[in-house]
C-alpha cells in the first residue's frame, strides 16, 4: 500500500451508511468504484492483514486516496456506482465495452411506407422493430422481407425521382408504388401484414392471406389468388425454420461461462416466443474477480447503459444465481420506471433456451482461449527469434495503397497479445506528394503517426513496414527523429515480399542494423507477421478504394460548369448514384431540386459527350 495513504486515519472518518466509494492512484486516476450497504464495514475489509484475493492485494497496493459519497439507500448506491463506472472506466472494475447502438428495422410513416435499416437516434417518424443483435441480422431480415412482402426499401429521394419502375419491380420484390403500379389500398394491406410479421405474428399473417386467397378465387381472380398462394407458402417455409416457444412473451435469456479470466455472456433475444437474434459479450474482467461481481456488473451496465437504444423486456433469465440479484432487480426497475425481473430457476421452454445460451457461451470461451493461446505462442516465438528481453505488448504495421498514384492511402493496424486491436486502427489520406511515390507516402504516414509522441503515449514495441529496404530506411529515419527525446523507441522490421510474392518466402529486415533474415514457411512467428501484414494491406486497400470512388464521383460531376458540392449531392441522392445520373434523360434530371432545364441539358451533354 502507498505510504501516502493512512488507512487507519481514513477509516475513522467513514460512515456506516450506504454509499459509493472511489479509489484513486498516485496519478489521481480512479482505479476502482464500489458500493456498500455499510461503507465502514466494506472499506475496512480491504485493509485486513493476509488478504487472500490477489486482485484485492494489487488494488490496495495502488491506493493513494479514497472518496466516499453517501446515498439514501442501497438501490441509490447501485445506480450511482454504475454511473461512476461508466464515467471513469476504472482498471480494476469489470467493464462492458459495448456502447454501439443497436440496429432496427424502420417502417416509415409515409403515403407509401418503406422498410429500412436504422441505427442511431430514432428521429424519423414511423415504427421501429427490434433491436436486432447486429447489422447482419437486419440486412438478412430485410432481404427476407423483400421476398415476402413487395414493399419498397428505397429512400424517399430515390422514390420521388422515379418515372419508371426499377429493377426490384422486375424481380417482384417491390410493387412500384412510386409509379402507380399498385393501388394505395393494396399497398397498405401489404404494409399491415409486414408489420404483423415483424411483430412475430406469423400465423395471423398467414390466416389473413388464406382468407384473401379464397376470396380472390371466389371472384375468379386466379392470378391474384396465385400470388397470395405463393406468399403463404413462402411464409410457412420461414415459420417452420424458426424455433418457437409456447410462451409468447418477450425476454432476454443469458448464458454465462467464466474461465481462465475470460467471461462470455451469450444473450438470446426472445420476442413473441421466437429467437429474434443472439449475441455474445466479453466484458473486460480484472484477474481474480469473483463470479458474483462479474454477474452484477454485467447486468447493471448492460441494462442501464443509456447510450444503447434497446427495447428492454420485463423478464431476464440468467444461468447463475448471485447474492445481490433482488437488489439489482429493484435498482433496474427504479431506473427504468418499469417492472424488471431476473429469474434463474426455470423450466420447460425457458430451460431449453437457457441450455442453448449456456452452450453457446461455453463454446465461445473455449474458442477464445484456444485462439488466445495460439496468438500467445506466436508472440513468444517471435520474442525468442528477435532475442527481446521484455514481452511484446503492442505491434503496428504500415502499408501504402494506390492505383497508379491515385487516391493514396496509408494504413496503420495494431495487434496486441490477443490479436487485432481494431479500435486502434488508423488510415491516413496522403496529400502533397508526387503520385506513385511510395517513399514519400510512407514518410508522411509515419510522421503523422508519431507526431508529438510522448513517453506516456501508445508506443509500439515492434513496427512492421510492408516494403523493402528503401521504405524501411525512410521509416527508421522518421522514428529516430521523433523518438530522440524518449528512452524507448519501437524496433522497426521491414517485410519484403519473396520471389513471386509467394507467402512463406518473405525477407525480414531489421531497421537499426539492416540485417536480413528469413523464417521457415511453417514458423508460427512468421504466421503472426503475415497476419499483421495482410491485415494492414486489407485495411489500406479498402480505404484506397473508398477514397478513389468518392474522388471519381466528385470529379466527374464537379468538372461540369455550375455543379458544386450541393448540386452534386442532390443529383447522386435523387437518382441513386453516378451511373444513374449518367443514364438519366434531360426530363429526369430536371426533376432534381436545383436543376434547371438549361443545367439539365448541360449535364446531359457533358456526361454523354
UniProtKB/Swiss-Prot annotation:
Xref: SUPFAM superfamilies: C-terminal UvrC-binding domain of UvrB (SSF46600), GIY-YIG endonuclease (SSF82771), RuvA domain 2-like (SSF47781)
Gene Ontology MF terms in the entry: DNA binding; excinuclease ABC activity
Transmembrane segments: none
InterPro entries for this protein: GIY-YIG_endonuc, GIY-YIG_endonuc_sf, GIY-YIG_UvrC_Cho, Hlx-hairpin-Hlx_DNA-bd_motif, RuvA_2-like, UVR_dom, UVR_dom_sf, UvrABC_protein_C
Record note on quaternary structure: Interacts with UvrB in an incision complex.
Family: Belongs to the UvrC family.
HAMAP family on file: UvrC (MF_00203)
Name of the protein: UvrABC system protein C
Gene (name only): uvrC
